[in-house]
């Protein structure tokens, strides 16, 4: 970009510094372009949450109306902690007023799932199947020498392609057949040589057990989308963001976060008129911020 503009990289960096030091807050976007769920009374929608990690110790938390493909809120934190999540969800609940979502979808971190249920009592909660599939691939290696692992992986990899209740029932039947044949492996224990470890025993196939638990524990959360069509099976809250990551490589973390904030804000204000409104709001806030810095 510096070459195209005929200026040095240092000068270009200085020109952009004010934008990187004053990234747009979600409330600016709410003011410039209120989301669909607030402009149309009782509009049905599904809430989605995910985090985009920018290396160790920095994650951007993204909250979406996945039904209308609109980002509602964002923030950054050192981790996807309950405190950080609660700090975001409180203003979202206030701003959406009584228009609660029909369902939620997330990567199923226990504490965050609990807060969702407490925030919107009685809401359907769907576990993102892409995250489930990713965990299962890790626990059930493709080239495992254990036939039971290979067989369970073959069954598990169907999870993202189930479209009907009949598909779900066939999926459960396949799991039942697997269990009838390999149940003993789930209970198999390893007893170490005396004195080599403090542990008396452990499960021999711990990853196999974890994968089995994912597939059979709280199965309603895996398939809410089959009974409530407005809820998706996967969380696309970060759709379109990954393609921009390469442009931020080499920047300090705080600038990477700022660029992501701008990207999220501009994804909500796509027309020239909306961006003009956002620009006016941002200038007022940025000017006030600079004045405060000078005074202090």
Role assignments for model-derived ranges:
Residues 1:
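Hydrophobic positions on the alpha-helical face of helix-turn-helix-like DNA-binding modules
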Residues 4-106, 110, 114-118, 122, ...:
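RNase H-like nuclease fold core
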Residues 20, 24, 97, 117-121, ...:
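Hydrophobic/aromatic-lined pockets within catalytic cores
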Residues 53-54, 110-111, 135, 250, ...:
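Short, solvent-exposed loop/turn segments at secondary-structure junctions
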Residues 102, 120, 153-296:
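Acidic/histidine-rich catalytic cores and adjacent linkers
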Residues 103-110, 115-157:
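Conserved beta-strand -> loop -> alpha-helix junction used to position metal-binding or nucleic-acid-contacting
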């Amino acid at each position: 970009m510096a070459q195209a503009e005929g200026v040095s990289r240092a000068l270009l960096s200085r020109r952009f510094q004010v934008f990187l030091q004053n990234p747009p807050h979600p409330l600016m976007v709410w003011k410039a372009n209120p989301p669909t769920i607030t402009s149309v009374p009782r509009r049905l929608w599904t809430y989605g949450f995910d985090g985009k990690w920018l290396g160790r110790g920095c994650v951007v938390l993204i909250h979406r109306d996945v039904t209308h493909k609109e980002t509602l809120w964002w923030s950054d934190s050192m981790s996807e902690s309950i405190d950080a999540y609660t700090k975001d969800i409180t203003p979202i609940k206030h701003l959406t007023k009584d228009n609660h979502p029909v369902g939620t979808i997330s990567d199923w971190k226990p504490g965050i799932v609990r807060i969702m249920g407490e925030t919107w009592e009685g809401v359907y909660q769907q576990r993102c199947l892409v995250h489930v599939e990713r965990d299962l691939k890790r626990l059930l290696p493709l080239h495992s020498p254990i036939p039971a692992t290979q067989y369970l992986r073959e069954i598990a990899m169907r999870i993202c392609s189930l479209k009907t209740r009949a598909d779900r029932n066939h999926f459960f039947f396949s799991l039942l057949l697997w269990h009838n044949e390999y149940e003993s492996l789930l209970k198999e224990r390893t007893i170490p040589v005396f004195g080599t470890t403090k542990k008396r025993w452990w499960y021999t196939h711990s990853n196999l057990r974890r994968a089995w638990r994912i597939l059979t524990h709280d199965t309603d959360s895996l398939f809410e989308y089959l009974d409530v069509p407005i809820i998706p099976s996967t969380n696309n809250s970060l759709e379109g963001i990954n393609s921009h990551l390469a442009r931020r490589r080499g920047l300090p973390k705080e600038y990477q976060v700022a660029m992501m904030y701008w990207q999220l804000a501009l994804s909500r204000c796509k027309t020239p008129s909306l961006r003009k409104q956002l620009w006016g709001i941002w200038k007022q806030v940025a000017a006030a911020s600079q004045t405060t810095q000078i005074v202090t």
